Each structure stands twice: as structure tokens, then as C-alpha cells.
Amino acid sequence: MEGVTYEMMLNVEQLERFGIHPTRLYATGGGATSDVWLKIKADILNRPITALSAKEVGAAGTCMLAGVAIGLYRDLRQAKEVFVKERKTYTPDAEQVAAYRPYYKAYRELYDAVRPIVEVINEKL
């Protein structure tokens, strides 16, 4: 769980390099049903994580877009009020955030060290 979340943190850092600073994240799908994993995500990512109630968010998103396209909803904000229901929000715990920090640093260093090897493998595929 932590490894996948460290990878998510790499993505968040990439967004931040481009000037996008997410202050809150949403979780969907199977992973959004695990209270333990969502708490880990909140602590590692140091941001609130809100789990959505919908199980099939792809289908819900399609319905939202279709509803706006045919005039059923004024815009996506209005469609969101109908389709998007928040189940629970997990907030970061400062002590846990600090505890995960050295592990993430080690993960990042390992990622950077292995990256050239992965590039060689990708060239051969």
C-alpha cells in the first residue's frame, strides 16, 4: 500500500513542478473502500483524501457529460450535485506525515537509482 502511495506522491510532485498544487484528492474504485489505505494515502500525500460513494465512477462521469450535452444539467457543477456523493474524508496526521517522510525519501532515491535500468529495459521491449 505504501509503495503505490509513494508512486502517487511522485505524480503529485510532478504536478507541483508544473504549477498545479492539489490541496485535496478524491479516491474512487476498489481502493476507495479501504479505510486503512485511505488513511495511509492521506498521511503520505499530506492532503485530505475524500472517498466517493459511487462504485462505477467512469459510468457516472459519462452520464454527467451526457446530461450536460443534452441540456438535462446546466453544467458539470450541477451534474456533480446529482452524481457525486462523498462517503468519508481522511485527514493527514502530522505525526504520521513526519514518520513516513524518511521512507518516502528512500523510495525516491531508489526510484532515481533504478530509473536508468528501467530505461534500458524499455528500449529492448
Language-model segment annotations:
Residues 1-125:
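Glycine/Thr-rich phosphate-binding loops that ligate phosphate moieties of nucleotide
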